[in-house]
Amino acid sequence: MSRRKKGFTNYEINKNIAKILVLHRVWDGLNQTKIAKDLNVSFQQIQKYEKCMNRISAEMLIDICNKRKWDITLFMNNKPESILDELIKNVNQMDPKSSPYPLRISQITEKWDKIDKVGKDNYYYKHHFTKGN
């Protein structure tokens, strides 16, 4: 399998993009249906991006970021965990009782755990690679 800069495999790149997509969506309190409507695709398509079943195109990623006013540079060469850590630092300065973010942080990490568990199998099955490459 080809390698990218910094030693990321194609799967790792797609997994990080999926995790960052989940992070932004959940952090903003959005569901997959809302994102899908914004992009004129089915919610199943968003689901497939988030499960690493389909690769998201650059055009679609740009479209999502423009419509949701997300910083596209966060999707490039960033570890999702470091982005979440920065968001958590900002939340820690708020009153946790009046903030929806502690629950959202929990939802994000739960969804990330699912990506870690099934994402690689989904990716390799979909793209006809052999596990372990």
Which residue ranges define each predicted feature?
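Short basic helix-loop element that most often maps to the first helix and adjoining turn
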Residues: 19-34, 63, 95
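A short, Lys/Arg-rich alpha-helix, primarily the initiator
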Residues: 2-27
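Short, basic-rich loop-to-helix N-cap that marks the start of a DNA-contacting helix
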Residues: 53-66
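Residue-level detection of the helix-turn-helix DNA-binding "recognition helix"
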Residues: 26, 40, 51-53, 80
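Short, charged recognition helix plus adjacent turn
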Residues: 76-114
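Short alpha-helical DNA-recognition segment
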Residues: 28-48
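C-terminal regulatory/oligomerization modules of transcriptional regulators
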Residues: 110-133
